[in-house]
Amino acid sequence: MNTRVTPTTDLDKARHDLDVVGYCIVEDVAPSELVSRVRERVLEQASAERDTGQAFVQDGNTQWVANVLNKGEVFLELLTCSETGLDLCRHVLGDGFILSCSNAPIAGPATGRMKMHSDQYWTPTIQQEPLAYDRLGENGLDRSEVSHPAVRRDYLFPPCMVTLVWAITDFTANNGATVFVPGSHMSGLQPDYRQNHTDAVPAEMPAGSIVLWDGRTWHATGANETRDQYRIGVTNNMVAPMIRPLVNYPYSLRAEVVERLDERQKQLLGFSTWTAYGNEGVPMQDLKYFKPAADQPGPML
């Protein structure tokens, strides 16, 4: 499949692209004023982390500003500024999905392309032999299968994750736009990260847009071939409510951030239960938010 997705404001088309191609692009989602404030805060934080020796740099010149919800109220504002992206996440995951992590990657000049991967890299390959199943704890990031995305499987493991990236700067083919292998989410396989995957296409979009993809879709941060452009995004990874998030938000969020959360944000950040998942020790407890552990009963005689 050589389909190249283009930006749209038509949510029906976006859902179709997401279902059939594995990713979609929606433009004009975030207000330009909000995008400007996010960009300013990302650059300020990135500079401070470099100056204090706390910067996390990957693939040569890509700096990740991690756990951004602790690093400025503007990131919390961005998380729920529009229902468009959240509706598309719901289209894939259903109700109750939660945030797994929120980071701001900055792809700097002369940065090579990331290795091709899927975010749902631990997904087991569907087996017909009952005892030939994958041991999920052994499916790490270095897992690869010599495969071709055009191969379709009769049975597929469903998507458990969706990644939503906000374009804080323009994403172009030569400044590090995310690249995708169209249709790869339907292969039931993981990419061979040692291959070049020349069939990958860039998700080009203007600032204020979002690109959103199925957790099974093969993708990578593209190469930034420019001399002076920094491609900035904010990456929000969403997971089904029974999946363990990358970041434990009830534990890791600063107290002043938790105090600002509204009910929608609390649900997205895992402060409420989903059926019996996330309870405080009382089965099927329906919690809107967690209480301090000191409030829980201890040994009793």
Predicted feature descriptions by range:
Residues 1-20, 27-143:
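Non-heme Fe(II)-dependent double-stranded beta-helix
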Residues 191, 210-212, 217-218, 222-301:
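Non-heme Fe(II)/2-oxoglutarate
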Residues 29, 102-104, 167, 183, ...:
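Short, well-ordered beta-to-alpha junction loops that form the rim of enzyme active sites
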Residues 108, 168-170, 238-240:
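Non-catalytic surface loops within mature trypsin-like serine protease
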Residues 112-204, 244-253:
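Catalytic core of non-heme Fe(II) oxygenases with the double-stranded beta-helix
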Residues 72-78, 151-152, 197-201, 220-223:
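Active-site rim elements
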Residues 102-104, 164-166, 234-238:
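A structural signal for short, well-ordered beta-strand segments
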